[in-house]
Amino acid sequence: VYIKTDLGHRLMIRRYNDILSQTEHFAPSESACSKEELPEELQSLASYLNSCGFPCYQNTQAQYFPLGDDAFEVMCDELQKAEHFIFLEYFIVREGYMWGRILEILKEKVNAGVEVRVLYDGTCAVALLPYSYPEKLEKLGIACKMFAPLRPFVSTHYNYRDHRKIMVIDGKIGFTGGINLSDEYINRTSRLGHWKDTAIALRGDAVRSLTLMFLQMWDVSSCLLYTSDA
């Protein structure tokens, strides 16, 4: 039954806001560069982002990938280098070549003592993954959660999904953009013709924001607060 007052969504927003307020001290309080140091056409955007808790960073390199095909090989190479932790947060995770290859690397890293966490949107449980898939990954030593799992007839947050695509490795490199972990995003399959989605890799200080964003959403999904240094 879809409740008109949408209590589930209201509770989720309250929980998210509580976590933001309790973790804001992990984020830089201001941008690393002044407004005047930026090109004029970017100053308003930088001010807006800073007011939303996403400051501008220096000491960061950005690498652009015009296709998921290009990003995927770099993602796998960087995953192989992980020494401390791997965080994955994606809207879509679908079994196939792309996810299978990543999962094999994750299993290797878990066996090497690397902490691995996977967070994916609950809509995947409708047709892409078994509802019990988090338990399967947990047995492999991978911490896994679904964001807002869909329960037919009782869910109150059908329209509130986690569309992020974030991969963070050791807090040193992060990937984000438009590609999910599914074969069409690397043109391994062709469901709708040639698939073009872009991605970027960040190396340096700006990865801190991606790390914090992941941990905040993880806490929203688990009702727990992360208290260690991000």
Q: Where are the language model's segments positioned?
A:
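N-terminal localization/anchoring segments of enzymes in phospholipid and broader phosphate metabolism
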Residues: 1-228
